[in-house]
Amino acid sequence: MQNQKTVKIGNIDVANDKPFTLFAGMNVLESRDLAMRMCETYVEITDRLGIPYVFKASFDKANRSSVHSYRGPGMEEGLKIFQELKDTFGVKIITDIHTEAQAQPVADVVDVIQLPAFLARQTDLVETMARTGAVINVKKPQFMSPDQVGNIVDKFAECGNENIILCERGSCMGYDNLVVDMLGFGVMKKVSNGSPIIFDVTHSLQNRDPSGKASGGRRSQTVELAKAGLATGIAGLFIEAHPTPDKALCDGPSALPLDQLEPFLKQMKALDDLIKGFEHIDIK
């Protein structure tokens, strides 16, 4: 069996052969009060279930389909909210950046910085992120095969940063649809020498109305897709929730209703424990 790397986020060990870590929160920071409420809910539930947890939110959705769509509060206000969440709940935080200038200021506050799928091949951004020394979550682009993510890992390694997590978020299937290749998880483990793989279930559920200006989604299938991913033996799940998904300011159609978070996580933990309790079968 290939050795699996462990990436440490504070006291959390993230690895494909360890209990899954939950990277979850809200798509975009809609308000300070909502962020506080949601983070408190996540922390209470994950503490109760014994699930390692990292809070996720974006301060700027720079790649919205429409110029009129809500993007977020911006970096300065977003980092203030993140710091308050850390001070209040003692939580680890992941957020995404889109420009080189954002890398160090964001890394000074949060625990994991995320390289967006649409920017994953931008070498200057990769180099700047690598130099922060932070843990990096790389979103696999929808247009990239699982084999090619090894090149991104190599770029970070050349810049001296091997604290890399890889995130599956679906692949383009024709126009306006995403599918998840379950064989891809094993391929990404192999080409990255055992780097932790996490599964962005929420964004893998996106689909689009060709005439629309925002992504649609299939949140009714969240449970089955998440279970399928965990069954491959991965390091974590990436989930976005909302108390009222139909009123969310971004990606509501794919968001898990917040009141269903605990029963969802109970099933995910039970499945992950089962899968990782099996003896590995190495088929050549």
From Swiss-Prot:
GO terms for biological process: keto-3-deoxy-D-manno-octulosonic acid biosynthetic process. Its EC number is 2.5.1.55. The keyword Cytoplasm applies. GO terms for molecular function: 3-deoxy-8-phosphooctulonate synthase activity. It comes from the Bacteria. Pathway: Carbohydrate biosynthesis; 3-deoxy-D-manno-octulosonate biosynthesis; 3-deoxy-D-manno-octulosonate from D-ribulose 5-phosphate: step 2/3; Bacterial outer membrane biogenesis; lipopolysaccharide biosynthesis. It catalyses: D-arabinose 5-phosphate + phosphoenolpyruvate + H2O = 3-deoxy-alpha-D-manno-2-octulosonate-8-phosphate + phosphate. InterPro entries: Aldolase_TIM, DAHP1/KDSA, KDO8P_synthase. One of its GO terms (cellular component) is cytoplasm. Keywords: Cytoplasm, Lipopolysaccharide biosynthesis, Transferase. It is found in: Cytoplasm. Pfam families: DAHP_synth_1. Its main location: cytoplasm. Belongs to the KdsA family. This is 2-dehydro-3-deoxyphosphooctonate aldolase. It comes from Aliivibrio salmonicida (strain LFI1238).
